[in-house]
């Protein structure tokens, strides 16, 4: 049955137990922190959706994510914590990690503490350690060493970019500020910039900071932002 967005499902094998599921959906320019029934903390970024049970039962704790979230998982060796996304299944006991799974973008699992196993759509499993990231995209699955702060600072109120392409930067800003971005030529998307920006600043403040590099300028009309490379 369904009532005001909460779906009730029976657990297979025990019809006497009814499990209530909640779905948390985050709009643009918003984020939300919640605590699950086992004490696990979850930070949800803009444009994300988390489906989770009101209480965990049985020998696993499973949630479903689309978008981006950061998890601080309570340790329970008898009940692994499982995050399912469109392209991966992440299994943990107790740890801190970030997951990004926006449509049309690379699927990222970034480990801050502990250890996790990431299973991709080909059922190949990758065990990673703190400071490592699993990347799933059209080329396949890879594991890289990363500076985790660049991928998790969003939960602390910042966008952090280190030699990121302007295309990736504008993708992330558009996810938060809900605008459409247009580039006057394809080469401008490959410009690399380093910046630390406050998430709750007005978008015009952030564009001014990026334009101070002297490489690009921005024009804005309604929800559309056009990026032009400055000729030297």
Q: Could you describe each region identified by the protein language model?
A:
Residues 1-232:
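A residue-level detector for the "anchor" residue at the start of short, highly conserved motifs
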